[in-house]
Structures are given as C-alpha cells and as structure tokens.
Amino acid sequence: CGTTFEDKEWELECPRKDGAALIYANYAKRQFEVRNDLPGIYRYANWMPICRTLEGSGAPVTYKSEGLAAHLGLSNLYITFNGYWPERNAVMKTGSFKECEAFSVCARNNAFTDKIMVVASAGNTARAFGRVCSENHIPLLLCVPEDNLEAIWADGPWNDCVKLVCAASGCDYFDAIHLSNIICEMEFFYPEGGAKNVARRDGMGTTVLSAVEKIGRIPDYYFQAVGSGTGAIAAWEANKRFIADGRFGSHWMKLMVSQNAPF
C-alpha cells in the first residue's frame, strides 16, 4: 500500500493492518557498507533493523569451494557457512544459522521491554534464541514440542530469564505455534513474530550479504534449504537491496530452494 513509518513499536504488519504484504525495511544507508568496527554479525548493521548490538554473535562465513566444486565440475562455487567452525572463524555456538535471526531480532527497537517475548520452535530457533536471550538477559518464553526436547541443548546453563513450556508428547511444531498464540493473548507476553518480523528476515539475509562481500557481485544462482520458505524471502529482499545499490550487478539471482517432504 506504500505506507511508511518509523520502526519503534515492534511492528509485525502494516499499521493499516490490511494484511496485504510483509513489512520491508528501507535503510538510511542505501549502499552496502561493512562495519568492521562492530563485532560478529553486526558488521552488517547498516542493513539490519537494530538499535543496539549484543554480545556473542558470529557472522556468516563465505569461502570459495575446492573439494565440492571439483566433485561437481564447477570453477566458481562459493559456500556460505552458518554454524560453528572455528578454523574458518565461524563461531555460532548453537551450530545453527538461527543465531543470525536471534541476534537481529533481539537488537531491534522494542516497545515491549517490560514484557516477555514468546518464540515457538521445533528446535533450532529455540536453541538460538535461548542462547542469545540468556547471555543478554532478555526475558523469553520458548514453546517447543516435547518430542523435540533433545534438540534443545547449550554449552552452559541458561539464565533464569529464559523459560520453556512444551506441547505434550505426540504434538508437533504447529501445536507449539498454537500454544504460543494462546500465551500471547495474555497480558505480559508478546510474539516474536516469525516471518512477519523484519529483523528475523534481515538477520537471515546476512547470508547473502556475506556472499556478496566475498564474491564481489550478486551470485547467478543461490542454493538454500528452507522450512517455511522465510529464508528464500530474506535472500530475495537482500538481492533487491544490492540491485538498488548498483555496484554489485542489476540481476536477480536464481533462487534454488530445497525442502523436506513433510513441509
């Protein structure tokens, strides 16, 4: 609808509430600039909707493939790694790219600092948000299927500001989402927002920022595994910003997404 507004109230949809589209961030810095003065993922702060930085983040790491490229017969294949691989300076301690989302979301301008954020997850997202909120003392309630509890691990005890509730054994991720929606109707809780949260998508989009920083241009093809597909939207939005920048190409990379059959 073309409505514009300042990001200050944890908006998850257009103020007109027409439900027609996702919020898209327009940043003051239209040209891509790496912030080498900031740690971890915040090197991409100019294209993240944040008002602060948090401790402990790691950025995606892009490198030119040798082994896989040779196996596939490719000469210009790059891999962007999100996880824990200290030898390549990848330090996401939960081993999940979801840390890109959590460190972005939790640094966003938030009108609900006196309330508790609610996140539904099947495992990876809970692990990442649990770590970030614990280390930065951000109140958090995680909703996870009981059968997925083995995916919730950490390299140390979580702070008491992080709590966990479970959908009973036999339930799945969608039941956890339903449980989180019920909780968010209560006075002292608010939803993180998932795909509707622009900070979630622009945190995911740092994977593309890392790739373009290393390669020097917009890729021709972009391969990524997806669950709900939010990561593909994030990649497309990052591509749009690079086209507007004008220094890295004017083309849309071909998004090649793979997905598990249950989705």
Tell me what each language-model feature is.
Residues 1-263:
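PLP-dependent amino-acid enzyme catalytic core
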